[in-house]
């Protein structure tokens, strides 16, 4: 193979978590209650001014925020209104999904915690969107804002201009003041069931031309602890480790998990009272990287 072609292929590679990031609400796995509520709200025209998305890392908070911003600003030749049904890529969709649309402003509250950052937002909300229907502010890790910053935001949240929407995301909802929560429609994004994660990884494996053993996918799904992003990252690592054939043995070694049969052997030694053999087996498993 031409080395230049190989380099180009490598340069074009995207990690699985980005390559298979959902682009509409139908792609959000395990979040059906939220999707149902938003579908009804958009269909009836009862669209909130602010949303609070909460959940553990990797369940899709930022992705949901971008999809929601896309739905609010959806515009095609046939559709020019907010909608959950986004079958085609609209005028603003690609830029919003890639986080580069001028009217969808993303801010990481972890690095913009002060009142000055919020004052800048308050000054900007007066102005109409440049090209989209709504100016959407996505504030990630909103719990990191200072008390002053939260207080400065309250008035704008209470009476925002009709062309402005706020979407907040947080992993620590208890740190968000109740005065802010009461002004938002709250969605608790669930940990994704391991069976759903396993099924989705199998689908990705098929698209990527990767053969993955069921036990390997099951171990990855359990290790992800409800986070699809973590599952995709681990799967990515497993593919890099084993190539186009991901085995349970390789994943077990990569994750530092004990072989089930060896765990049973350890317990059998203990039940027999053979402490020396049990300690030897324990040591052997520890040396191979198993988590004690």
Q: Would you name each region that the model predicts?
A:
Residues 2-5, 65, 85, 92, ...:
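Extended, largely alpha-helical regulatory/partner-binding modules appended to the mid-to-C-terminal parts
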Residues 1-186:
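P-loop/Walker A NTP-binding region and its immediately flanking N-terminal helices
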């Amino acid at each position: 193979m031409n080395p230049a072609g190989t380099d180009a292929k490598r340069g074009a590679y995207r990690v699985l978590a980005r390559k298979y990031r959902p682009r509409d609400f139908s792609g959000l796995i395990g979040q059906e209650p939220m999707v149902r509520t938003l579908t009804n709200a958009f269909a009836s025209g009862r669209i909130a001014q602010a949303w609070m998305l909460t959940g553990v890392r990797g369940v899709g908070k930022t992705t949901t925020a971008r999809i929601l911003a896309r739905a609010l600003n959806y515009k095609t030749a046939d559709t020019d209104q907010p909608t959950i049904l986004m079958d085609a890529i609209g005028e603003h969709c690609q830029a919003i999904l890639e986080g580069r649309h001028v009217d969808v402003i993303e801010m990481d509250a972890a690095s913009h915690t002060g009142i000055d950052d919020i004052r800048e937002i308050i000054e900007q909300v007066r102005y109409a969107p440049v090209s989209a229907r709504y100016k959407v502010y996505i504030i990630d890790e909103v719990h990191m804002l200072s008390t002053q910053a939260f207080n400065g935001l309250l008035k704008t949240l209470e009476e925002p201009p009709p062309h402005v929407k706020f979407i907040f995301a947080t992993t620590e909802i208890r740190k968000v003041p109740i005065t802010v929560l009461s002004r938002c429609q709250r969605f608790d994004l669930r940990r994704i069931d391991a069976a759903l994660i396993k099924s989705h990884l199998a689908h990705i494996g098929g698209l990527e031309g990767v053969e993955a053993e069921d036990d390997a996918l099951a171990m990855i799904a359990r290790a992800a602890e409800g986070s699809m992003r973590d599952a995709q990252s681990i799967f990515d690592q497993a593919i890099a480790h084993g190539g186009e054939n991901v085995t349970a043995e390789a994943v077990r070694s990569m994750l530092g998990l004990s072989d089930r049969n060896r765990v049973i052997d350890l317990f059998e030694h203990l039940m027999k009272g053979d402490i020396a053999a049990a300690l030897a087996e324990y040591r052997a498993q520890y040396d191979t990287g198993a988590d004690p």
